[in-house]
Structure formats: structure tokens, C-alpha cells
Amino acid sequence: MSNSMINPSIVNLLEKVDDRYSLVTITSKRSRQLIDGAKPLVDIDSTKPVTVAINEIHEGKITYKTVKEGIK
């Protein structure tokens, strides 16, 4: 049994994104889309938007662009 309460683990999720900040940002934006009525891209038992978003990220269903420029 895993010590992690989150499945997939943070370590596995960080393999899919650049860093923790990106993971939080992508998860929150996708969760908001799901709350607003977007269809889930994965088939899981949970209906919780954050859980669905995390699983979508883990399965590689979510893409994102990194903006290199800061606010000027």
C-alpha cells in the first residue's frame, strides 16, 4: 500500500509538468472548466473536479503553453 493519499502521486504528476506551480495552475484552471460544464477527458468514478483534473493531467490529456515573458 502506498503512503500517498493522492493517486496519482505528486511525484508522478510532476513528470507531466514543468514544476509545482504549473501543476497547481493547470489543475485549478482545468477544475474551473469542469465546474463550468466541460466534459471530463478521462473515465473515472469520481465526480470531484480536482480529482478529474489531476487524472487528466496524469494521463496526458491536458496540454499547456509556458509563457516565458513576465509582466512588464
UniProtKB/Swiss-Prot annotation:
GO CC terms in record: cytosolic DNA-directed RNA polymerase complex
> What name does UniProt use for this protein?
DNA-directed RNA polymerase subunit omega
UniProt EC number? 2.7.7.6
User: Cross-referenced Gene3D superfamilies, in alphabetical order?
Assistant: 3.90.940.10
GO terms (BP aspect): DNA-templated transcription initiation
Which PANTHER family does this UniProt record tie to the protein?
DNA-DIRECTED RNA POLYMERASE SUBUNIT OMEGA
Single GO MF annotation:
DNA-directed RNA polymerase activity
Asked if the record carries the keyword Nucleotidyltransferase, the reply is yes
Report the function annotation for this chain: Promotes RNA polymerase assembly. Latches the N- and C-terminal regions of the beta' subunit thereby facilitating its interaction with the beta and alpha subunits.
Q: What class of enzyme is it?
A: transferase
Instruction: Note the InterPro entries from the entry.
Output: DNA-dir_RNA_pol_omega, Pol_omega/Rpo6/RPB6, RPB6/omega-like_sf
Provide this UniProt record's keywords sorted from A to Z.
Answer: DNA-directed RNA polymerase, Nucleotidyltransferase, Transcription, Transferase
The record, for HAMAP family, names:
RNApol_bact_RpoZ
Family statement drawn from the similarity comment of this UniProt entry: Belongs to the RNA polymerase subunit omega family.
Question: How does the annotation summarize its subunit structure?
Answer: The RNAP catalytic core consists of 2 alpha, 1 beta, 1 beta' and 1 omega subunit. When a sigma factor is associated with the core the holoenzyme is formed, which can initiate transcription.
The reply to whether Membrane figures as a keyword in the UniProt entry is: no
Q: Which reaction does it catalyse?
A: RNA(n) + a ribonucleoside 5'-triphosphate = RNA(n+1) + diphosphate
Q: Which Pfam families match?
A: RNA_pol_Rpb6 (PF01192)
